[in-house]
């Protein structure tokens, strides 16, 4: 081969590998190279008819390239100045910078941090980021796939042809990167990978994409990153003060929402609202109802709507079902303007096995465990993250931090924590692998959760975010500080309280006396953790019926039972959570294909329940006795906890500074007249709430809004009062 041969410097094996799209290092062959005969440009452009090289500065011709093999062009040029390629696509001429004329974009330092498990390096290095390189606009693509033989980025810009844009491997981190000039936001793309043995894999969506196609499409989309990361936030005051609004001593009442079905548009094929519409409709509603926070079931992109978001693949991308990422940022900003916090359900426990997702990402079990006893969740037919791997742990923590940092979210409710903590969770004896000490505890998950909670406390510029665990076992120290050996969550769902009290309420009042302990047992462990009392979507799905449907009795009794239960819940220690539809006594259980039955509000009973929840939220926020000592023993005292025969409960709530309330619940349909209760202090007490009030749909029985104690001792108190206890009702009294 002569020195003037356009193939000079190319070995036959390299030529074969390039045209067959299996070369592991395309930058070693393509682009500008200096040879003894002068500068040479090589370009891989399948389906091109002719290629020439022109000066980037003035368009002057620098040389013509010869086609060595179909799609592979090479030739000498007169100058090694910055250049562009003039490509004749059989009659359509394109002028563009050569992807392979640009050097590496990612620095060694952040790549080193990525390999070491730094979540901020994930945010810095991976995904698709519009930028300028050497004055040329384009997009830097980067993906972690250490075991792939070759990775190409494919998309609208190259006709989804993996031969066009093979990427550069940065060996120290197993990251493939490529700067593609003249590509911009809005472009669809995926990655084409060859496994270690050269086997082509299904096209993969970008695990770190900030934007995606709307399902059933599965492509990633180059996001307007600056419109998110430089969003003009107006919530500085909220962010700086929110730490004081989300503590154990704060009133927290959460409205749980499935965003897609909250209010469907029947006239437009039952479509869900987008973020702009949700901001316009949902925020004023939630605020008017007195809730302090809205919690969304997972909004990270997920292929299957029937998973309700709990099988996500786009851990960094708000679902395209609701609009663009910057629209979600605008929703959060408007929520904060209205004084509402935003909590997201977040799923680090498992991921679905869709071929375009994380499973066998680079031809190996990269994100999941290789052993199905560790890497497969048989209950959900999903894959379990390998949290013992630095990069996987960093990937997930980066996702959590991204929602907090990029979108100013106020908290993460971490899903399925119990399944993460135990290696034998829902497994037969021979279907799990012990930890290194022979135990059932998942040490890698424990370390992950501790690190997550530590990192959430130190997100630059956005202090005060919280984490909430959905943890259904008695694992100790879920909300204890990491420094004290705990997991470090701020709050934990009290699943035991929920199960026990719902079981009690489902009983016919005749039999409730035999289940009295179900209503009192929660106080035995109420201060072992910082709890949220959850009446979530989980209790109104899969044939369980609605909250109203669980209540026994005729129509009147069902509503009365639900109102009494809400009164008990809102005055019981623990933060509050209620799923959409529950606030007005939805009749049917949750159906993600339909909205809550808002038309029921035309019925006075349903409207009455809604008004009660509104008033309970207001009472809760206005009365420090109901929240200030939620997580401290001094805030609660049983006055009557043992009257199982009458199914009556009475307790005292106090803020420790002189303000106190007395709550009395009658859980039978029998009015109790002259029922004597020992009162913490003598004098007048105002009846500030009665769930049997006529405005709520009740019988309007009560104490006329005011009671006076007398000197007759009762229940260990020197003062007492003879009360009228309405049927199936909760009353709240405040010392006047």
Curated annotation (Swiss-Prot):
Organism, scientific name: Paraburkholderia xenovorans (strain LB400)
List the catalytic residues.
415 (nucleophile), 470 (proton donor)
Pathway participation: Glycan biosynthesis; glycogen biosynthesis
Q: Which superkingdom, per the lineage?
A: Bacteria
- SMART domains assigned to the protein according to its UniProt record, in alphabetical order: Aamy (SM00642)
Q: How does it assemble?
A: Monomer.
Enzyme class, UniProt record, top EC level: transferase
Which key words tag this protein in UniProt? Carbohydrate metabolism, Glycogen biosynthesis, Glycogen metabolism, Glycosyltransferase, Transferase
Q: Which GO terms describe its molecular function?
A: 1,4-alpha-glucan branching enzyme activity; cation binding; hydrolase activity, hydrolyzing O-glycosyl compounds
**Cell cycle as UniProt keyword:** no
The molecule here is called 1,4-alpha-glucan branching enzyme GlgB
Report the catalytic activity: Transfers a segment of a (1->4)-alpha-D-glucan chain to a primary hydroxy group in a similar glucan chain
Identify the gene encoding this protein: glgB
Concerning CDD domains, the annotation shows:
AmyAc_Glg_BE, E_set_GBE_prok_N
GO terms classed as biological process:
glycogen biosynthetic process
Q: Name one GO cellular component term.
A: cytosol
Extract the InterPro entries matched here: A-amylase/branching_C (IPR006048), Branching_enzy (IPR037439), GlgB (IPR006407), GlgB_N (IPR054169), GlgB_N_E_set_prok (IPR044143), Glyco_hydro_13_cat_dom (IPR006047), Glyco_hydro_13_N (IPR004193), Glyco_hydro_b (IPR013780)
Q: Which SUPFAM superfamilies match?
A: (Trans)glycosidases, E set domains, Glycosyl hydrolase domain
Give the family per the record.
Belongs to the glycosyl hydrolase 13 family. GlgB subfamily.
Q: Which EC number applies?
A: 2.4.1.18
What job does this protein perform? Answer: Catalyzes the formation of the alpha-1,6-glucosidic linkages in glycogen by scission of a 1,4-alpha-linked oligosaccharide from growing alpha-1,4-glucan chains and the subsequent attachment of the oligosaccharide to the alpha-1,6 position.
Cross-referenced Pfam families, in alphabetical order?
A: Alpha-amylase, Alpha-amylase_C, CBM_48, GlgB_N
